[in-house]
Amino acid sequence: VREVLLLLFLSLPFTASAADAPWWGFALHGYPVTETRLAGLKYETGLAPHVVVFFLQWPSHGETGPFPEESLEAIWSQRALPCLTWEPMYYRDGQEITILADEILGGKYDAYLRDFAEHARRWGRPFLIRFAHEMNLDRYHWGTDRGGYGPESPQIYQRMFRYVVESFRRFGAYNVRWAFCPNAESVPYGDPSAVWNRPEAYYPGDDVVDVLGMDGYNWGMTKTREKDGWQSRWQTFGEIFENLYRSLTRLAPEKPVWVFETGSMNAGGDRTAWLREALSLAREWRLSGICWFQVDKEVDWRLDIRRDAEAVGIVRGGPPLPGYGSGGGE
């Protein structure tokens, strides 16, 4: 039954009705994802997700790298849909090194792509790949070095995205579905010379995108110009996502829309009220899913049932969670 439901979900296009609550998920930091970690997640949050987002970088060379079968199996065993955020970069001496588009398009990583696609095909079950997410942030500058991030970046990104998807199709990995996922706010922004950095400018085409995604956060009042170099403010879910949501649905109105990373702090407002509004607006917009960034990173975004019981209750009021009965009882 579980496999049938997930296969039905991936029989796109899929758009929730206004009466449907979105699927609930968590985005997790660290690799691999194990059944032990997922059990800890359920204990910590009181929630068993429909979707689990995780992250994997590429190898520094163009040969084979790890295929995340352990993580995929662990997520699947919990009756959840895996979503791999696949980052074309690697770490060297603690620094992120972005893989250049010329290396990917020139064939240096063809062996890696073939090996990964063939492993995905043999694994056989459906999962999402969120390739090179948040491409409209100069923090990533996918396909170029930081100095090369500029007006040519959208076209570079499109070529990379299409090349990767077409490689998977060439090797029969049709169980993989592809997510295009910009950030809610583009950086650089506010600069007339950066008008090229609109999320929709990066869109690689309907034929290689199955799911539309959005990332964005409410930092509340946690950041100050004096300490952090920028001033955060309280933002509602609607303030964060509406402009991007409207842009994406104009771009591809028949494709499902997900929030793959979000979270809210309490500083400056009420996180529980924020989450309530988020889920209400998600129904109105017919979002297919919302994934909470369950990570202690720049700030501690994590939900914890011991301090966030009311917020957890709001989430449990949605569709029955795997491992829970309707209404949220275990």
Enumerate the predicted regions with their spans.
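Glycoside hydrolase catalytic-domain groove-lining segments
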Residues: 66-87, 207-267
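Substrate-binding cleft/loops of secretory-pathway carbohydrate-active enzymes
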Residues: 183-213, 269-279
